[in-house]
Amino acid sequence: MTYVYAFDHPHEKPPMSLKDLLGGKGANLAEMTSVLQLPVPHGFTITTDACRAYMGGRPGGGPNEPGGWPAGLTEEVAARLVELETSMGKRLGDPADPLLVSVRSGAKFSMPGMMDTVLNLGLNDESVLGLAKQTGDERFAYDSYRRFVSMYGRIVLGLPAEPFDAHFDKARERSGAENDATIPADALADLVEDYKALVEHHTGMTFPQDPADQLRGAIEAVFRSWGGARAVAYRVKERISHDLGTAVNVQAMVFGNRDDNSGTGVGFTRDPATGAAGAYGDFLVNAQGEDVVAGIRNTLKLAEMQRLFPSIYDELLAIFDRLERHYRDMCDTEFTIDQGKLWMLQTRVGKRTGGAALRMAVDMTTDERMRLTHAEAVQRVTAEHLEQVLHPQVGGGDVQVIATGLAASPGAGVGKAYFTADAAAEAAGRGEAVILVRSETSPEDVHGMIVAKGILTSRGGLVSHAAVVARGWGTPAVVGADGVHIRGASFEAGGVTVKEGDVISVDGSTGRVMLGAVEVTVSEPPPEFDTILGWADEIRAGKLAVRANADTGADAANARRFGAEGIGLCRTEHMFLADDRLPIVRRMILADTAEDETAALEELRVAQKADFYEVLEAMDGLPVTVRLLDPPLHEFLPRTEDLLVRASMPAGLSEEERRLLRAAEAWHEFNPMLGIRGVRLGVLKPGLYAMQVRALMEAAADRVAAGGRPVVEIMIPLTIGREELALARGWVEEAVARVSAGVDMTIGTMIETPRAALRAGEIAEEADFFSFGTNDLTQMTFGFSRDDIESRLMPAYLEQGLLKRNPFDTIDAAGVGELVMLAAERGRAAKPGLKLGVCGEHGGDPESITLFHAAGLNYVSCSPFRVPIARLAAAHAVLSGRAPGS
């Protein structure tokens, strides 16, 4: 097995197709070098195979138990290093003219800022003198060395950043320098000694001087960073597999910190926030790449390069054009100017906001250089992009703006200010809405950024760590708000002091920071939103419909506005919980005689009829699936514990409360999820289901009389066998016969127990349709109680790799998904025309929708606000090429 490839290695396939092996950064560096022949510093890539071997190569090894340095890797790295030295005419560690390299991570999927980078590797106490002599610039040499010692100490040796930062600040103050670029050489040389002393104090060892030891240490650090807490947290959030590993890229250094004819920057071929055509980005003069994203200095706009470096700016724009033509997408780049020479250090398809993704996708269908098809444009937009454009925005009304910064990630965020990632995470764990406030963020802050409703930094630009991560996650963010002066757990801005726990608001669309909680409104999607969804609907038409879960006329009308093609789940129990209905339900439960029960049911029938009428009216002409009562009756009664507490008080219980207590005790269940609910409740109280069916059919008849076209589907919950469904079907048909409605009506059942899935062939004989209730099917298949395991057990299972996905968010393909496939196959074998749908929360999850399409389902159903996401995901599923039933 080959572990190391030079950037210019002649691969049999296009390098950009080898991201599994080379990682995204390595594949694109090879593509730019060997295919596009852009100015890229020479280097080589250590593959993801090597990382996986290192992380889990020993027997029993795993992500938290390193397998060790792979056999043969040392020799391969040495061979590629000799080639690199030959091509550059320099040798690593040469005291007279040293080659310096960067060591960077590069996983298959972009994980900006989550893993580690080491720059200027190869410097030591001797080679720094050679670098100073060769360049004639002692300041540059020691600036590079102090950066290397600091990075190596933090990333490879695991030292905290704060002591390095403190020494740096002291050096700058002592020298009277305005910023890092003006600290003189002698102060930087002293700073190197301070840094080395820090390393020895914390580790008990002197700073490594052998470049070979430095290189191996840096490679291992990048491997280890794949299993680091921030990278794991990012992958859990982004649903990236822990098994992929990261590649490592070793590349000859070019220097943006050499002089004022040098610089470094991050550039996008289009605006990643709005999608507007034209170059976009930030850069710094006399700086190294990490300075731009770290927010150490506020950056210059890319357009400023036209004034400072006009010929290089033109060259960069020409490269941007070539990259867009080649990748047929917006690209994110990193570049360095080394004494007037432009070098490209990285490119990748750039992360973007939801609005930008929509605009780019539509624009690129008419861009002569790209000519995307409608299908390609639809595939460029993700579910997360749609969610972002539906993000809340700052509404009307007076607001108190206390500072402004750069609008880094759109949307409105409201919450309590917290000044460390740990404090933010703790507050979010208590259920508080949090705004994370930092001078600048770093990868160590990820656990606080994940839970934040908004992010505010006082330093940094639009390509800083905070901006890039927030845009990728759709978290509102304002960065570079230099009017915000942070002092410990408070900040001052606009004459106001904001302390930890005070409520502030950030507007990532305008850059405003506001005191207090602002009014938040639902945003208006851009016109491209409807364009993309229209194309998505054309792609999935006749293959996979999208319905909504809605319980009221207002919900149904809202769902229809979002493009729902019917109601896949109308939960009748929600109609019972209204303040004016609950007393009637309790009278029905407490009834001592059949007459009393019938009287209560009659009152409920009248109320439910009105509810059903509103839903049928909103969905006129489209199918409405009504699930008969599902939860156990004790959910409509007061809690036994509350009644017992009141009974112990001097006033005691009223007569009605005593009756409620007896009923609550009678209907109490130790495991309600597996108790008397669904069709089992109908067996004990058949009059309840008969009442609901009559109310529904009478509402449908009234709709017909009013000129409507109701399409009714009656669904029996929680059946486990044919006999049970046959009994329930009899109740329904008897009730329907009492109402001459002239209405299209079918009767089906939910498949939500493993037994029902296994016996689907028999159940299909009594059903016109199946709807998979994947919430309960997941609970019963795993033996998980969702309410009990999601807050404590699930995070541990995900972080330790025991589960790759939360099965309540994305369907478990190997278990629950297989039951869905099996039930669909057996049901259709018994009844070829059987309609199949899903109404659990998985119906709005893109990955789950792909499985449902493959299983041959006719529709998915989800909450109204996820209907647009499901429409897009259904089109993606159709375009994936996985045929139904495969």
What annotation goes with each model-predicted range?
Residues 44, 481-482, 517, 774, ...:
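Short secondary-structure boundary segments
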Residues 404-444, 493-531:
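Extended, non-globular alpha-helical segments
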Residues 104-105, 525-531, 535-885:
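Conserved alpha/beta-domain cores
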Residues 476-477:
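Hydrophobic alpha-helical bundles that form the membrane domains of multi-pass transporters
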Residues 249, 418, 435-439, 456, 458, 480, 549, ...:
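Structural motif
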Residues 226, 389-415, 531-548, 555-558:
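Flexible inter-domain linker/hinge segments
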Residues 1-397, 426, 432-435, 442-447, ...:
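Nucleotide/phosphate-binding sheet-loop regions of phosphoryl- and nucleotidyl-transfer enzymes
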